[in-house]
């Protein structure tokens, strides 16, 4: 199978199928799909610059956890168990390195479902 054929097969997969594929690759090769996090020590002048990347944190699942779990699954592509664990163990980071517009959209969707969310 060529690289192009593999890419075409991946393009035709749903989010759930892709999630299963990633898990299978992690298990087969003993790797993780987690993105490396770079830690940068910033100076005072850099802190004054406008922030361009934001982190969306789930503070609490609220009273309507089922709706929040559904939205978390939709936004992250996680499976039911993973989304439930994330909501049950809040506060947790939901997404990192997103634009301000995307962060606000995520926050609005989650708050509409009943979650408490903070954007940093």
Swiss-Prot record:
Cysteine disulfide links: none
Keyword Ribonucleoprotein annotated: yes
GO CC terms, sorted: cytosolic large ribosomal subunit
GO MF annotation: an example: mRNA binding
Protein's GO biological process: translation
Keywords, comma-separated and alphabetical: Ribonucleoprotein, Ribosomal protein
KW Ribonucleoprotein (keyword) present: yes
InterPro entries, per database record: Ribosomal_bL12 (IPR000206), Ribosomal_bL12_C (IPR013823), Ribosomal_bL12_C/ClpS-like (IPR014719), Ribosomal_bL12_oligo (IPR008932), Ribosomal_bL12_oligo_N_sf (IPR036235)
Job description of the protein: Forms part of the ribosomal stalk which helps the ribosome interact with GTP-bound translation factors. Is thus essential for accurate translation.
Subunit structure: Homodimer. Part of the ribosomal stalk of the 50S ribosomal subunit. Forms a multimeric L10(L12)X complex, where L10 forms an elongated spine to which 2 to 4 L12 dimers bind in a sequential fashion. Binds GTP-bound translation factors.
Protein family according to the UniProt entry: Belongs to the bacterial ribosomal protein bL12 family.
PANTHER family xrefs: 39S RIBOSOMAL PROTEIN L12 (PTHR45987), LARGE RIBOSOMAL SUBUNIT PROTEIN BL12M (PTHR45987:SF4)
The protein's name: Large ribosomal subunit protein bL12
Organism for this UniProt entry: Brevibacillus brevis (strain 47 / JCM 6285 / NBRC 100599)
Lineage, broadest ranks: Bacteria, Bacillati, Bacillota, Bacilli, Bacillales
Gene that this polypeptide is encoded by: rplL
